[in-house]
Every structure is written in C-alpha cells, then in structure tokens.
Amino acid sequence: MVYQPACGARDILPLDVARQRWLEQRLERVFQSWGYQEIITPTIETLATLTAGGTVHPETVIQVQGSGDEPLGLRPELTASIARAAVTRMAGMQLPQRLYYKTNVFRRTTGAELGNQQEFFQAGVELLGATGLAADAEILWLVQECLGVLAVGEAYLLVGDAHLTQQLLGTFPAELQKTVRQCLANLDRVSLQALPAPWRDRALALFDLRGTPEEVGERLAQWSDVAGVVDRFAQLQQLLALVAESLAITLDLSLVQSFDYYTGIIFEVLIPTETELRLVAQGGRYDQLLSIYHPDGATVPGIGFVFNVEALLQAVAIPPAALLAPRSQWLVVPRTANALAAALHHAQTLRLDGSTRVELALLELTPEQIRAYARDRQIPYIAWIESDAPPQIEALSDGATSLQIQRV
C-alpha cells in the first residue's frame, strides 16, 4: 500500500515552506508596523461558533468527532473565531483592538469540487471596536502597503457595500431575493436573464452595477427612490477618495461575499495572470458579528481582510537568495564509537554563540566520503574528534566555494 495525504490535503516541502515563510514574514512586519498584534485561535471550534449564527454555511465546515455531545469542526475562516475570542476572552480591553493572524483554514468540498484542496493558508487582520471612515480607510491603506512591500505589480481593487447591495436586493419580491443574490455571488448572468419581466431588467442592471464611482453613480439613479441609497453611496465615494492611487479601483455594487456577516464595505483584490484574474485578498466590515457570541447581544464593530497565501505566492517574485538554505559552518566527526560523547560536547560548544550551525556526522563513512559530504553541503570546516585527544580541524573552504549552492 502506498500512503498518500488525505483527500484535499498536501505536503509542503522545504523549498515551498521557505517561500511561504518569506511572504508571511513580510506581511507580518507590515501588520506590526500598523500596531497589530498576533492572535492564535483553536483549529477546532464548536460548530455553533464556526457557523456564526447561520452567516457561515455549515456545509463548508469539515466536522470532526469530539469526546462530548457538541458538534465540532475545523475552522473554515478566522473572523468568527476571533470574534468569539474577543467577546469571551478580551471583554473589557481597551478599544480598538488590532489583531493579525497567519494560519491554516479548512473548507469542505462537495459535488464537482470533491477531491479539491481543502486546506488553505491565510494571513490577515481584524480591527475591532472602530467604525467610520477612518477605520475603513486604514484597512484599505494597509492592504495597499502589503501589496507594495511584496512588489506585486498590476492589481485591481473591487470595492462594494454589503448594506447598500442588500438595500437594492430589497427592491425585488421576497421570493426572488435569494435567487438574485446567488446569481450575483456566482456571476451567473444567464440565470438572471430567465427571470420574469420587469425584474429581469432590474436584476441585470444590478449585475452590471460596477465601474468608476461616476459611472456607478449614473446607473444608480434608477434606485434613487430607495431610502438611504444616495447617502450611503456618498459615504462610499468619500472613502474611495481617501484611498491611494497605487491600485486600480473598481466600484462594484454587485459584489457579494460567500460569508453573510458583512454589513458595510466589502472588497476583493485581484491580480491578472495570463489566463485569469486571481483572487489574492478579500475582506469587509461586520458590525453585528460579535453580538452573536455575547450573552446579552452586545456588539462591537469590526472590519478586516485576509490574504490567500497560496494565490499570492503565485503572483510574487521571491528573490532566489531568500530561498537558500543557511549552510552549516561545521561538521563534527567522531572517529570512533568511543568519541561520540566528546563529539556531542564539542558540537554543543560550537553552538554556544547562538548563530553557528553545526552538524554531527551520523553515518560510518571513510574520511574521503566525509569530505565529499562536507563539500556537497558547503560546510567549510570539519572537526575530527578523538576520545582522548584535542579536535583536529580541517578547512575545506576552497573546495566549498566552488560548489553549487544547495537549496532546501
């Protein structure tokens, strides 16, 4: 029997680990420079926590068997877990709270997706306890700075407003609202064309409600009689005016996120490839989510975003030097079995400065084979150890510098 990773899981080998760590470290530095602190939440949560009062669909959760009666699952995203932690563990702390994370999430695949990847890596932030223009602008500026630090080239920012889009959906008959919303989420124009008149034309107009703020404002005129639409759109324009011009911005009022807890701005970052636009980040405002976890229904406003690490890695050029494995400086070789204790002590002494990398020779090889191993690994010094004599030091620096660099 050949053992493989479970369906939807994969191994990440050293070179890919190095690439991922390079990216995560740069994102982490940006997060920290804006005052964000790292939070780690459980991989396993109760199903009630993960589904966030019904705003996260249970079918996306990979459920696991626990020791108790309460259903458990692997987190499909982090926002719900952080909201739960903020209510249960961080109550009374000074607001706003700026939190960031870098971790894995799990999403169940079904039907045609069965067998696809089910574990994903994310890095993101949550800003809790702040609402209004300044908080929304901070998040969008933070997204842009991250992309700039990673030297991402061309990128597109799609900005919508979940509340405003819900107001527009509210103009449809109740029996059609779910259908129209699903079509928007799935970019399904064909199904909208099958709706009865006059709702078909109105749904298609909503589907196409994207472009520059000026273009969207003109198309939004047919909904000007809907209460609050004009004022809400004016606030959205004010926010976009604050966002730096390093990203091409498209206002998209047809934008619908898969999680239903968003109450304000929502956004996506797309990067073009040769064949498609790749989604590398998404986020938005969720001012009612924390009330789900509070015993009295009290809430704290929140906004955040997440980078999809795997997708972002495909769009970032990582310098080859960043992926080089740090080489060991010493190879410590016990000449006999009796010299092993002395070799272990000598290797530990060499490591005392905290920065020297030392390997212990483990295989029974000839001296020439030992030297060949050291040259292949670019180890410049060999310490030959006897049980009753001082170490003999052999320098191989000339041979090492002529070898190809070993990568992990």
UniProtKB/Swiss-Prot annotation:
**Family designation:** Belongs to the class-II aminoacyl-tRNA synthetase family. HisZ subfamily.
Q: Which NCBIfam families match?
A: hisZ_biosyn_reg (TIGR00443), PRK12292.2-3 (NF008940)
Q: Nuclease among the record's keywords?
A: no
* Subunit and interaction comment: Heteromultimer composed of HisG and HisZ subunits.
* Gene3D superfamilies per UniProt: Bira Bifunctional Protein, Domain 2
**Pfam families found in the cross-reference section:** tRNA-synt_His (PF13393)
This one is known as ATP phosphoribosyltransferase regulatory subunit
Q: In which pathway does it act?
A: Amino-acid biosynthesis; L-histidine biosynthesis; L-histidine from 5-phospho-alpha-D-ribose 1-diphosphate: step 1/9
One GO biological process this protein is involved in is: histidyl-tRNA aminoacylation
Which keywords annotate this record? Amino-acid biosynthesis, Cytoplasm, Histidine biosynthesis
InterPro entries linked to this entry: aa-tRNA-synth_II, aa-tRNA-synth_II/BPL/LPL, HisRS-like_core, HisRS/HisZ, HisZ
What is the annotated role of this protein in its UniProt record? Required for the first step of histidine biosynthesis. May allow the feedback regulation of ATP phosphoribosyltransferase activity by histidine.
**Subcellular localization:** Cytoplasm
Q: Which GO terms describe its cellular component?
A: cytoplasm
Gene name of the record: hisZ
What would be an example GO MF term here? histidine-tRNA ligase activity
The organism named in the record is Thermosynechococcus vestitus (strain NIES-2133 / IAM M-273 / BP-1)
Misc note? This function is generally fulfilled by the C-terminal part of HisG, which is missing in some bacteria such as this one.
